[in-house]
Design a protein with these regions (language model features):
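Tandem CBS (Bateman) regulatory domains
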Residues: 1-9, 23, 43-91, 99-122
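Eukaryotic tandem repeat interaction scaffolds
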Residues: 7, 11-33, 41
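Core beta-strand residues in small-molecule sensory/regulatory alpha/beta domains
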Residues: 37-38, 97-98
C-alpha cells in the first residue's frame, strides 16, 4: 500500500497564518510549498512560494492563496495505482490523507523509486 513508501513528517500550516510566517517556515525547512490545514488539521490544499510571490503582498493570511489542485490518495490505497496516478498527474508529489482527511504524508517519485529498489534488491 501507499503507507509503505510515503514520506511522513510533512510541514503543514494553518490557513489563517500570515504570509511572512509561511515564507519563514519554507526557508527554515528548505521547501517551496506548504500543505495547508484547517483548525481540525484537515487538508485544505497547498501554498507555494510562487503563489506568495505573485499575490502575497495584497493579503494578510495565506487562506486566499491556497490551491486545491494537488492530487490526493488515502492511506491503504494500492501502491501501483498511486504510482500510476503520480506519473500521469505531472505533479511532483501526491498528498496522502488519512480517512479523517488529515495529512498522513506525501508520495514523491523519489520515495517510489526507493520503495521499488527495496523490493527488487532488498
Amino acid at each position: 500500500t501507499v503507507d509503505h513508501f510515503m514520506r511522513t513528517g510533512i510541514i503543514t500550516v494553518n490557513q489563517n497564518r500570515g504570509v511572512n510566517e509561511c515564507v519563514s517556515r519554507m526557508q527554515h525547512h528548505n521547501v517551496d510549498t506548504l500543505l495547508v490545514v484547517d483548525e481540525n488539521r484537515r487538508y485544505q490544499g497547498t501554498v507555494s512560494i510562487a503563489d506568495i510571490r505573485l499575490t502575497g503582498h495584497v493579503v494578510k493570511t495565506i487562506g486566499p492563496l491556497v490551491r486545491c489542485t494537488t492530487p490526493v490518495v488515502h492511506t491503504g490505497d494500492n501502491a501501483k495505482e498511486c504510482f500510476e496516478q503520480l506519473i500521469s498527474s505531472g505533479f511532483p508529489y501526491l498528498v496522502v490523507l488519512k480517512q479523517d482527511e488529515t495529512v498522513a504524508g506525501i508520495v514523491t517519485k523519489t520515495s517510489m523509486a526507493s520503495a521499488m529498489a527495496e523490493q527488487l534488491w532488498g
